[in-house]
Amino acid sequence: MASPRTITIVALSVALGLFFVFMGTIKLTPRLSKDAYSEMKRAYKSYVRALPLLKKMGINSILLRKSIGALEVACGIVMTLVPGRPKDVANFFLLLLVLAVLFFHQLVGDPLKRYAHALVFGILLTCRLLIARKPEDRSSEKKALPESAEEQPSLYEKAPQGKVKVS
C-alpha cells in the first residue's frame, strides 16, 4: 500500500494540476466561460497599465495574459500527468507565477476577495513542494532500540577500556 506521503503528493499534484489547466484555459479562450474570459482580459489590461515597464518592454495585456495562461496549462498538465522531477519543476514555476499574480493584484489595489484563491493555491503549491522534497523516512533501516534494561549495554561496556563514561 502507498504511504500517506505518496497519497498526499499525488492528490495535491492532480488537484493543483487540474486547477491550473482550467485557469490557464480560461485565460486563453472564452469557450469555458465568456464572463470569466472577459474579466481576465479586463484584469490584465489593468496590470499592464499599472506597470509601465511591461509596455516599455513591448509586452501588452494580450501577450501577458496568453503567456501566463499557456504556462499555467503546460505546468498543470505536467503536474497532473508527468511523474518525477519535472513535476517539481512545474510546481516551482507555478509558485513563481502565483507570486507574480499576487504582486499584480497588490499593484492595482484589488481587494482580498479578488486574489484569495491565489493565496490559497500558493500555499498548497508550497506544501506540495515541501512534502515532495522532504527525504523519505526510512524507519525500517534504523536499528531497533532495545526494549528492556537487560538488553541495553551498560555505560561501562560502551566506554573504551580504562575509561568510564559519565553522562
Curated annotation (Swiss-Prot):
<keyword id="KW-0968">Cytoplasmic vesicle</keyword>
<feature type="topological domain" description="Cytoplasmic">
    <location>
        <begin position="83"/>
        <end position="88"/>
    </location>
</feature>
<dbReference type="GO" id="GO:0051131">
    <property type="term" value="P:chaperone-mediated protein complex assembly"/>
</dbReference>
<comment type="function">
    <text>Molecular chaperone which mediates the proper assembly and functional expression of the nicotinic acetylcholine receptors (nAChRs) throughout the brain. Essential for the proper folding, assembly, function and surface trafficking of alpha-7 (CHRNA7), alpha-4-beta-2, alpha-3-beta-2 and alpha-3-beta-4 receptors. Stably associates with ribophorin-1 (RPN1) and ribophorin-2 (RPN2) (components of the oligosaccharyl transferase (OST) complex) and with calnexin (CANX), both of which are critical for NACHO-mediated effects on CHRNA7 assembly and function.</text>
</comment>
<dbReference type="GO" id="GO:0005789">
    <property type="term" value="C:endoplasmic reticulum membrane"/>
</dbReference>
<feature type="transmembrane region" description="Helical; Name=2">
    <location>
        <begin position="62"/>
        <end position="82"/>
    </location>
</feature>
<feature type="topological domain" description="Cytoplasmic">
    <location>
        <begin position="1"/>
        <end position="5"/>
    </location>
</feature>
<feature type="transmembrane region" description="Helical; Name=3">
    <location>
        <begin position="89"/>
        <end position="109"/>
    </location>
</feature>
<keyword id="KW-0256">Endoplasmic reticulum</keyword>
<keyword id="KW-0812">Transmembrane</keyword>
<feature type="region of interest" description="Disordered">
    <location>
        <begin position="135"/>
        <end position="167"/>
    </location>
</feature>
<dbReference type="GO" id="GO:0030548">
    <property type="term" value="F:acetylcholine receptor regulator activity"/>
</dbReference>
<comment type="subunit">
    <text>May interact with NGFR. Interacts with RPN1, RPN2 and CANX.</text>
</comment>
<dbReference type="GO" id="GO:0005783">
    <property type="term" value="C:endoplasmic reticulum"/>
</dbReference>
<protein>
    <recommendedName>
        <fullName>Novel acetylcholine receptor chaperone</fullName>
    </recommendedName>
</protein>
<dbReference type="InterPro" id="IPR040399">
    <property type="entry name" value="TMEM35A/B"/>
</dbReference>
<feature type="topological domain" description="Lumenal">
    <location>
        <begin position="110"/>
        <end position="114"/>
    </location>
</feature>
<keyword id="KW-0143">Chaperone</keyword>
<keyword id="KW-1133">Transmembrane helix</keyword>
<feature type="topological domain" description="Lumenal">
    <location>
        <begin position="27"/>
        <end position="61"/>
    </location>
</feature>
<feature type="transmembrane region" description="Helical; Name=4">
    <location>
        <begin position="115"/>
        <end position="132"/>
    </location>
</feature>
<dbReference type="GO" id="GO:0005778">
    <property type="term" value="C:peroxisomal membrane"/>
</dbReference>
<feature type="compositionally biased region" description="Basic and acidic residues">
    <location>
        <begin position="135"/>
        <end position="145"/>
    </location>
</feature>
<keyword id="KW-0576">Peroxisome</keyword>
<dbReference type="GO" id="GO:2000010">
    <property type="term" value="P:positive regulation of protein localization to cell surface"/>
</dbReference>
<feature type="transmembrane region" description="Helical; Name=1">
    <location>
        <begin position="6"/>
        <end position="26"/>
    </location>
</feature>
<keyword id="KW-0472">Membrane</keyword>
<dbReference type="GO" id="GO:0031410">
    <property type="term" value="C:cytoplasmic vesicle"/>
</dbReference>
<feature type="topological domain" description="Cytoplasmic">
    <location>
        <begin position="133"/>
        <end position="167"/>
    </location>
</feature>
<comment type="similarity">
    <text>Belongs to the DoxX family.</text>
</comment>
<feature type="region of interest" description="Interaction with NGFR">
    <location>
        <begin position="43"/>
        <end position="54"/>
    </location>
</feature>
